[in-house]
């Protein structure tokens, strides 16, 4: 399961703030894991090797790395989510994508969590 968040601030070379936090992503079984970054949702992703989400607050994620992050404000970061149950309780509808890695939505599933 993946979530997506935009880069809203890049105040330091090794720190970026994303527009998703505890209200958006599950965190009880681990923080989101960054997979890649693209200039737009569905765009070609550049891997974020060595990057990690180190903290979440209500509405933001803190993306950090030992090396400068290859991100710009407005970029979209894909995140692996640790626990589906606490993702389902945040949404009434979940998109179903065509295949793993795709952003083409082919169906919606209603949740009753």
Language-model region placement:
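Active-site anion/phosphate-binding pocket segments in diverse small-molecule metabolic enzymes
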Residues: 1-113
